[in-house]
Amino acid sequence: MFPISAALLDAMVLSLVAREETYGYKITQDMQTAAKVSESTLYPVLRRLQKNGALETFDRAYMGRNRRYYRITALGAAMLRQYRIDWEEHKGQIDSILKEKEETQHDNG
């Protein structure tokens, strides 16, 4: 598995929260398919995105206590749109290098 940059982590969190209002532990679980991210890594990201105005929080009762939920803001949605554009460009550049390498190996083999 490849290391996840801070920007990619932000993009992934914003994307998950854009799908549904959700809470930290669920975000961690949802991210496990793509990245090994612990709660201790995720919560500072959530706090930073909240402080920057990309996310907002609210509490919802759950089993007799409050659970903190996150929702994306208009600013967060705009950031996510840009992250998606940047990701497609970056992914295309990486794909072109990886595919070129595979073709070169087959040609030389």
Features from the language model and the residues they span:
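Short beta-strand "wing" residues that participate in macromolecule-binding interfaces
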Residues: T57
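Short, hydrophobic-biased segments on the C-terminal half of alpha helices
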Residues: L46-L49
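N-terminal helix-turn-helix DNA-binding core of bacterial DNA-binding proteins
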Residues: M1-Y43
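Glycine-centered, phosphate/nucleic-acid-interacting loop/turn motifs that mediate DNA/RNA or nucleotide
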Residues: G53
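Basic, amphipathic "hinge/linker" alpha-helix immediately C-terminal to the N-terminal HTH DNA-binding motif
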Residues: Y62-R84
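Proline- and acidic/polar-enriched loop/turn elements at helix boundaries
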Residues: Y43-P44, A61
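Amphipathic alpha-helical dimerization/coiled-coil segments
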Residues: M79-G109
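Generic recognition of well-ordered alpha-helical segments
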Residues: Q29, A74, E89-G92
